[in-house]
């Protein structure tokens, strides 16, 4: 589930895990998430904190910002104006 700036994506994703808990999600049914990103990567910076970026079809790796792990749902990462959950 991705919520960002008024758009949402709730559907199946390809989930790829990297070292240290960093992960990337890519939508399966459509080319992009609602906000135009082809993939979203949550880079772990330290325990409970991450930097989130979205890759656009034009190849721009846009910085979404800092996120913290949700206390209510540990599958979710919450930023200032976005939430990324990987179930």
Where do the model's predicted regions map?
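Cysteine-centric segments in proteins
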Residues: 1-87
């Amino acid at each position: 589930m991705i919520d960002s700036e008024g758009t949402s994506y709730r559907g199946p994703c390809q989930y790829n895990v990297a070292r240290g808990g960093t992960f990337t999600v890519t939508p399966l049914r459509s080319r992009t998430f609602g906000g135009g990103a082809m993939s979203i990567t949550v880079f772990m910076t330290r325990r409970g904190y991450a930097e989130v970026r979205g890759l656009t079809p034009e190849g721009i790796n846009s910085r979404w910002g800092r996120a913290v792990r949700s206390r209510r749902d540990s599958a979710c990462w919450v930023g200032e104006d976005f939430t990324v959950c990987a179930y």
